Amino acid sequence: MLNYLWFFLAALFEIFGCYAFWLWLRQGKSALWVIPALVSLTVFALLLTRVEAAYAGRAYAAYGGIYIVASIAWLGLVERVRPLGTDWLGLAFCVIGATIILLGPRWSAA
């Protein structure tokens, strides 16, 4: 269960870090936005290493579903844009895929 906490915290820090770059490069905000962006993206990377998983690739794949959930939430809550039906449909497919990866059986490679 602690993995989900790390995933959600990592998603928030990653989205904020990327959004800070977006504000600077796409919306003409101050270049000082780079500072919190870099700090946030560093914290994101550190948080993702807290996930208990045998392989980084599997952890990142499972995290992808959480990231997409957080991104759609960010779209609505921070950017005040109502998600489209296609956003919700895509989110559902991604969450199903991430759940399969996260909860799927683990066999040895022997």
Swiss-Prot record:
Q: Quote the subcellular location field of this record.
A: Cell inner membrane
Question: A single GO CC term, please?
Answer: plasma membrane
Membrane topology, from the record: Multi-pass membrane protein
Q: Which UniProt keywords apply?
A: Cell inner membrane, Cell membrane, Membrane, Transmembrane, Transmembrane helix
Report the transmembrane regions from the record: 5-25, 28-48, 59-79, 84-104
- Organism superkingdom: Bacteria
InterPro entries for the chain = UPF0060
Q: Name one Pfam family in it.
A: UPF0060
- Keyword check for Cell membrane, yes or no: yes
| Family under the similarity heading | Belongs to the UPF0060 family.
**Matching NCBIfam families:** PRK02237.1 (NF002586)
Q: What is this protein called?
A: UPF0060 membrane protein Psyr_3752
Protein's organism = Pseudomonas syringae pv. syringae (strain B728a)
Query: Upper taxonomic classification of the species?
Result: Bacteria, Pseudomonadati, Pseudomonadota, Gammaproteobacteria, Pseudomonadales
